[in-house]
Design a protein with these regions (language model features):
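Active-site anion/phosphate-binding pocket segments in diverse small-molecule metabolic enzymes
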Residues: 1-10, 14, 28, 62, ...
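Active-site-proximal beta-alpha core segment in soluble small-molecule metabolic enzymes
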Residues: 4-15, 23-183
């Protein structure tokens, strides 16, 4: 095994989902974008399909792969459409698309869609003053509006959450005046843990995979561990330890087959003594040749060492890595 392997616990993902669903008390739209945050979208979706109302992905390509895998649930594409090709593929695979602006709405003709509302994050969405016009345009284009959603930009800020919730509720009421069965959803993992308004559904992402966005805490279980193999033991010669001068004199070093080419940060971590190599890192001590070593079991702790978030670590490390599923 020359490359690291990610061991993903589907049992833990299901347990995390149960916890979040209990907190929210409404159906779940499970976010499996970016290959389920690096955990493998098809495998994760099959494991939790019986527990969710719908899946959400980033792109039409991601949605098409889920449908082709036979996950048996509707799939919402969160990124607005930008081309006729997107629209054709969305139609072919029966995807639910996002209409977030008048240009994106134009590509949604005849499609099932959720309207995105910009309540303060300023990423995607119609502004509240555009909702009435958007509904008129949707009717002209025969868009089948099945939902309306927004996103909390700082779920730990109670004042901001209150303002966004109020704005969203007003916009959702307008949408429901034209489409009474439109599903309203606002809260992702942070919003759920903050006790935000659940409306008709919630959209957990990070929490499914075992992490609460700071500053929240919850009894979630990280679902991915990454293992790398000892590929050499070295009696040190000269002054290096990987790509750096050794900080001290070593009596023994070993090399693991994991580096920044596998999504880890070049600056270090994983117990490395120097900067990581592309496909390897050097650590102190001696371990039997071929030993499997866990190099990542807490993405939040690893992220904190590098001034980033668990989101970035999971997506970077999980991307393209061989995965073994447990439970």
């Amino acid at each position: 095994m020359q490359r690291p392997v990610a061991v993903v616990s589907l049992k833990d993902i299901r347990a995390n989902l149960r916890l979040l669903a209990r907190r929210a008390g409404v159906p779940v739209i499970a976010v499996v974008k970016d290959d389920a945050y690096g955990h493998g979208a098809e495998a994760v979706a099959h494991a939790i399909a019986d527990m969710v109302a719908m899946f959400a992905v980033a792109t039409v390509d991601e949605g098409a792969r889920l449908v082709a895998a036979g996950v048996g649930r509707d799939v919402l594409v969160l990124t607005p459409l930008t081309s006729d090709m997107d629209a054709l593929r969305a139609r072919a695979y029966g995807l639910v698309v996002t209409a977030a602006s008048f240009p994106s709405l134009a590509f949604c003709r005849g499609l099932r869609a959720h309207l995105a509302v910009n309540t303060g994050m300023n990423r995607y969405g119609f502004s509240p003053c555009e909702i009435a016009s958007a509904l008129q345009a949707a009717a002209r284009l025969e868009v089948r509006v099945e939902g309306v959603f927004s996103h909390l930009y700082e779920p730990s800020d109670s004042v901001a959450v209150k303002e966004q919730t109020r704005a969203f509720a007003a916009c959702a009421q307008q949408v429901r005046s034209a489409y009474p069965n439109a599903v309203r959803h606002l809260c992702a993992t942070g919003g759920i843990l903050a006790g935000g308004a659940s409306f008709d559904a919630v959209r957990p992402g990070l929490g499914l995979y075992g992490y609460a966005p700071p500053p929240f805490t919850a009894e979630l279980s990280p679902a991915m561990r990454v293992f790398a193999q000892v590929v050499q033991n070295t009696a040190p010669y000269g002054g290096g330890a990987g790509y750096a001068a050794a900080a001290k004199k070593f009596s023994a070093l070993h090399t693991l087959g994991a580096g920044y080419g596998h999504g880890f940060f070049r600056a270090g971590g994983m117990g490395a003594e120097g900067r990581l190599c592309m496909d390897a890192c050097v650590r102190e001590g001696r371990l039997p040749f071929g030993t499997q070593v866990c190099v990542l079991d807490d993405a939040a702790a690893y992220a904190a060492q590098h001034g980033t978030t668990a989101y970035e670590v999971l997506v970077a490390v999980g991307k393209g890595m061989e995965k073994v599923y447990d439970g």
